[in-house]
From Swiss-Prot:
NCBIfam families: squal_synth. Gene3D superfamilies: Farnesyl Diphosphate Synthase (1.10.600.10). GO terms for molecular function: squalene synthase [NAD(P)H] activity. It is a multi-pass membrane protein. Pathway: Terpene metabolism; lanosterol biosynthesis; lanosterol from farnesyl diphosphate: step 1/3. The keyword Transmembrane helix applies. Its EC number is 2.5.1.21. Expressed in all tissues analyzed (seedlings, cotyledons, inflorescences, siliques, leaves, stems and roots). Highly expressed in roots and pollen. This is Squalene synthase 1. It catalyses: 2 (2E,6E)-farnesyl diphosphate + NADPH + H(+) = squalene + 2 diphosphate + NADP(+); 2 (2E,6E)-farnesyl diphosphate + NADH + H(+) = squalene + 2 diphosphate + NAD(+). It is found in: Endoplasmic reticulum membrane. One of its GO terms (cellular component) is endoplasmic reticulum membrane. It is an enzyme of class 2 (transferase).
Amino acid sequence: MGSLGTMLRYPDDIYPLLKMKRAIEKAEKQIPPEPHWGFCYSMLHKVSRSFSLVIQQLNTELRNAVCVFYLVLRALDTVEDDTSIPTDEKVPILIAFHRHIYDTDWHYSCGTKEYKILMDQFHHVSAAFLELEKGYQEAIEEITRRMGAGMAKFICQEVETVDDYDEYCHYVAGLVGLGLSKLFLAAGSEVLTPDWEAISNSMGLFLQKTNIIRDYLEDINEIPKSRMFWPREIWGKYADKLEDLKYEENTNKSVQCLNEMVTNALMHIEDCLKYMVSLRDPSIFRFCAIPQIMAIGTLALCYNNEQVFRGVVKLRRGLTAKVIDRTKTMADVYGAFYDFSCMLKTKVDKNDPNASKTLNRLEAVQKLCRDAGVLQNRKSYVNDKGQPNSVFIIMVVILLAIVFAYLRAN
């Protein structure tokens, strides 16, 4: 759960945090008894607790398909991310990965920690995949094939232009959006709109660009070789080499570059909102909406923040818990996007080279949210000043003592 100091500063986080903790514990206790499914869900909890919690919203059949889809793509991503694998060995694996998912004898040892376990015991994922309905299998195979080919292409070339950046993000994340839409269709839960491919792609690009921005330092410090996803067309305006952005003497230029990257990501929000409006199934809606809200929140935190080049920048755990707890309808999504766009807007320096473009995109988002006519009576994500009075702090400490005693007893 969050630290005691943070919870005392943000007491409104406590109840959602407790609910999230109990939900995680419940999900961990519901591991299927079959060895292959047990491995898949246990691994899902290890590689992404937040995703494993959100996926619980789905019905069993669709949940199983999405779980396998996620782990297959995580395994593919593990191969791509392992910079110790020689290119002439990595590229054929990426290109052929969609065939390996049918082979319960196949595995390839790479990655570290839980990802190495995933790769070493990939036969469990293959066994689960082979139990899915044909429609799910075909969707997963197609997306894995296209993604592997795209990853292989960018192993051999750098991200030079913004078009390259969009193409790379399409391969590694936009295709995830398309694949999920195909799984929803195969489940009979959703009807695809005429522009479903474009807006599904935008859902993936918005999440991926947020991750690429947030993970700059981790990627640039990767050993034995840096991972570089920021397009030269953007960073080349501010530095001679991408790694120069992490040095303190370049902070002003680095932050300007960061702000342009965030501004680029904002262009996908209109499509994301359009996609979420089209969803009919409440569980699928929550599954899709929660990560999108966390992405706009992360961008608001990263914007104009030099800490992106110094360490880890992420939403506090209590705010994540609030997003999971509160996101139930499209009105909640509009409220969250409005709040976080307002937060981001207050951080825009009018002397920033891209200030005008940033403000225009934020104002367009705010107008979309206002025009929906559902912003009244919402609980704000950003107006909490985090300054509880001393009496309240004492009450919270007593409450926490009782809660922790209860949790230990159970």
